[in-house]
Amino acid sequence: MEKDDLTHFNDEKRAKMVDVTSKSETKRRAIARATIHMNEETLARIHAGKIAKGDVLAVAQVAGIMAAKKTSELIPMCHPIMTTKADISFEDDGKTALTITSEVVTVGKTGVEMEALTAVTIAALTIYDMCKAMDKGMRIEKTYLVEKTGGKSGTFKAEA
């Protein structure tokens, strides 16, 4: 795509929301991932339910789902989307890294990549917020789109 082909700009080169009126509705799915690194003790306390603010993973899961649904309110040019599925899962390395994965699905005229990315980002920020009293050095890293399907551009899979 050439610079002149960018669709978020009008004839005056000012920002606009892309017109998706004539696009066909298709099933669209996106998976995103982010990793938060923390002290070993922090991860152990999360799993043991010993964080003063409550069940960290349950709250982060709900925050991620809510974020997917609110993406168009946070990112100016994102279309409001009827989200038909939003799921958040967690996997850790048993030491210091917790990986957050989101899956977002819709049937619509535009994709859900931004919703999936927003979901993992907000879930990671929620974990940071709930654990910062004991571990201010946590790092949120490697937030990326893993896969997207549907729509005119077809399937995308990140390189492993």
From Swiss-Prot:
Purpose of the protein: Catalyzes the conversion of (8S)-3',8-cyclo-7,8-dihydroguanosine 5'-triphosphate to cyclic pyranopterin monophosphate (cPMP).
Question: Which species does this protein come from?
Answer: Listeria monocytogenes serotype 4b (strain CLIP80459)
**Quaternary state and interactors:** Homohexamer; trimer of dimers.
Descriptive protein name: Cyclic pyranopterin monophosphate synthase
Residues where substrate binds: M77, C78, H79, M114, E115
CDD domains of this UniProt entry? Answer: MoaC_PE
Q: Which Gene3D superfamilies match?
A: Molybdopterin cofactor biosynthesis C (MoaC) domain
Per the record, the similarity remark reads: Belongs to the MoaC family.
EC annotation? 4.6.1.17
Tagged with keyword ATP-binding: no
Q: Which GO terms describe its biological process?
A: Mo-molybdopterin cofactor biosynthetic process
UniProt-annotated catalytic positions: D129
Its annotated pathway reads:
Cofactor biosynthesis; molybdopterin biosynthesis
Q: Which reaction does it catalyse?
A: (8S)-3',8-cyclo-7,8-dihydroguanosine 5'-triphosphate = cyclic pyranopterin phosphate + diphosphate
Transmembrane ranges, per UniProt, are none
A GO molecular-function annotation: cyclic pyranopterin monophosphate synthase activity
Keyword terms, alphabetized:
Lyase, Molybdenum cofactor biosynthesis
Does the keyword section mention Magnesium?
no
The gene coding this protein: moaC
What's the top EC group for this one? lyase
Q: Which Pfam family, any one of them, does this sequence belong to?
A: MoaC
